[in-house]
From Swiss-Prot:
The keyword Cytoplasm applies. Coiled coil: none annotated. Its main location: cytoplasm. Residues 1-64 are annotated as: Domain I. The gene is ruvA. Belongs to the RuvA family. NCBIfam families: ruvA. This is Holliday junction branch migration complex subunit RuvA. It is found in: Cytoplasm.
Length: 204
């Protein structure tokens, strides 16, 4: 099992990245709440990974800390929640927000996440509340900040908007919804990561 990667960040295409380790490039999918904290392209990154083997693919999901990965592993233990939905859940809200929503049994907030209906939200609360009991979000997970993300290298506002829409589609949002939200919040000087962050905030 691949549990940790340390290497040079080659590409950032939210929610995916490419990291080179000893001459080998690894494609990794990462929740946007973690993606914002990545270093610049060309710099060294350390990523904790969850390895998934399927009949048709081998997938890596990446996180900045062991604690964030631990939460992801707890999320995908819930009935009906796979890695793809787990990625969407932890992109739509931060680790601390998710823990708080489960502890408060806040179904109305959870159902705003892509792919999460009322039944899935209820299962998340029922199955995870006891497992999260006593877990302090502040102690367990990297706090989410409003610090400006690094420039993802977008060459124009149009390409930034296209990348943002593509990222939202990859997370499970519908094309019309993704395009509408991005167009509403887009400003000429915004990077794709800033657009994604603001879009996700507006939809939860």
């Amino acid at each position: 099992m691949i549990g940790r990667l340390r290497g040079i960040l080659l590409e950032k295409q939210p929610p995916e990245l490419l990291i080179e380790v000893n001459g080998i490039g690894y494609e990794v999918q990462m929740p946007m709440s973690c993606f914002y904290e990545l270093p610049n392209i060309g710099e060294e990154a350390i990523i904790y990974t969850h390895f998934v083997v399927r009949e048709d693919a081998q997938l890596l999901y990446g996180f900045n800390t062991v604690k964030e990965r631990a939460l992801f592993r707890e999320v995908i233990k819930a009935n009906g929640v796979g890695p793809k939905l787990g990625l969407a859940i932890l992109s739509g809200m931060t680790a601390s927000q998710f823990v708080a929503s489960v502890e408060r049994e806040d179904i109305s907030t959870l159902v705003k996440l892509p792919g999460v209906g009322k039944k899935t939200a209820e299962r998340l609360v029922v199955e995870m509340k006891d497992r999260l009991k006593g877990w302090s979000a502040g102690d367990l997970f990297t706090p989410f900040t409003d610090a400006a993300p690094v420039d993802s290298g977008s060459t124009s506002s149009n390409s930034a908007e296209e990348e943002a829409v593509s990222a939202l589609l990859a997370l499970g949002y519908k094309p019309v919804q993704a395009s509408k939200v991005v167009s509403q919040i887009a400003k000429p000087d915004m990077t794709s990561e800033q657009l994604i962050r603001e879009a996700l905030k507006s939809m939860v």
